[in-house]
Amino acid sequence: MHVGRKMVEGGRCAEPAVHNFTESITRWGITTARMKTGTPVRIDKRSVHFEDMEEQPGDSDFHQFSYMGEHRVLKQLPCWTCYTNKKVHETLKSGLADSPLYNGQIQSTGPRYCPSIETKLVTFPDKDQHPLFLEPEGEDTNEMYLNGFSSSMPMDIQLNALHEIPALRDAKIYRPGYAIEYDYFDPTQLKHSLESKIIKGLFFAGQVNGTTGYEEAGGQGTVAGINAALHCVGDKTFEMNRDESYIGVLIDDLTTKGVDEPYRMFTSRAEYRILLRQDDADARLTEKAYELGIAKRDRYDWWIEKKEAIGRIIEFCANYPIKKDEINPKLEALGTTPLRAGCKLIDLIARPHLNLTNLSEIIPDLKAALETPANRKEEITEAAEIKMKYKGYIERERLIADKMHRLEDIKIKGRFNYSELHEISTEGRQIGRAHV
């Protein structure tokens, strides 16, 4: 760990280091390299002048992470925003010679999209200010996380710079920001199950695979844990495709492309984003989880009920006739083009400005159908509407994904000699050899 020129062995702050682990792995032929990450200063909220900051409240309308059970809203804590200024920048620049990132102390690569405050100053010298976000670490603590101020500068430089910000002029800190270098292992030496290709029965997950972020680690840990359990009982492996989950995209990227910088999952990395929607995660994964024994029967039954309810709404809309003379005045009142001929209700839902909510206000039969106990949950009507409104796009993307699956399922023997395949480029042969 690096704070200025001070270097300390450890895990995270106040956690012990793991010694000789890398050496015990690499002696079997597993490749390793180094990466770095950083974390911001932690501030005591009792020393902050919040009157000099702008409050940033949380969302008032948000989706649940789980559709199981009743919706329970937790107490919302606001974040606060402020900005750096020229004096802050001058203070930080005065300490660049002692910054591990610029004095040669750290040579490894850090996250592309999480630059330190000193990197921002060097990369964007024309900027007079950078935004900062003060975030509570919890309801029962005074510790606050200063997002945007990741740093490995000496502690006195960090503190002096903070004191140049009006809201933080009296700031006291729990601990300074610091950088940490760590080993990771080449993820292209892993199978899609996250089992090592070199050491049978050894599974890797998280930061050791070159990723950064809690969700990235959690997703890999879930897959690695499932496959480790399956391996112990001799069952086949569990793998997810790129069109089934973002975890599948992440693992496929790691194991086929490798990493040369800390990997973070973005929706832009997925080519099947219409299939990987927030509303259909249960549709994609519940049955798989139930078959593996990691989802209980009540979750599976709830999903079956939801699927049937969605189907009923879609069937109702697909069969419900709309007469133009009856609906046109109401459509004009909603600001949408009147019909030239009669149609089915599902055709109206495909229009951009129409949805189940506003149509239910002008079509009593639809309102009655949506208000039945089995259909009235928001997540059910939302999922049904998405399936109807984007039906053509979903089907087209499904065809593209299925075509790719047919190509992916053509197996190449492990001992295939790519060096003799002169019909492809040198780079192509090198990539092929690397993944044998």
Predicted segment positions?
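Internal hydrophobic alpha-helix adjacent to the cofactor/substrate pocket in enzyme cavities
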Residues: A217-M240
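A glycine-rich dinucleotide-binding beta-alpha-beta segment and adjacent secondary-structure elements
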Residues: Y145-T211, E239-D252, K377-R429
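Glycine-rich phosphate/pyrophosphate-binding beta-alpha loops
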Residues: Q207-E215, E271-R273
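An anion/pyrophosphate-binding glycine-rich loop and adjacent beta-alpha core
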Residues: E23-L159, I251, T256-L339, P352
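Glycine-rich loop(s) and the adjacent beta-strand/alpha-helix scaffold that form part
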Residues: M1-I43, I165-P166, D170, V223-H231
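Extended, charge-enriched "interface" segments that sit outside catalytic cores
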Residues: R269, L275, T286-R433
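Flexible, glycine/charged-enriched surface loops at secondary-structure junctions
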Residues: M35, Y102-T109, L168-P176, D235-M240, ...
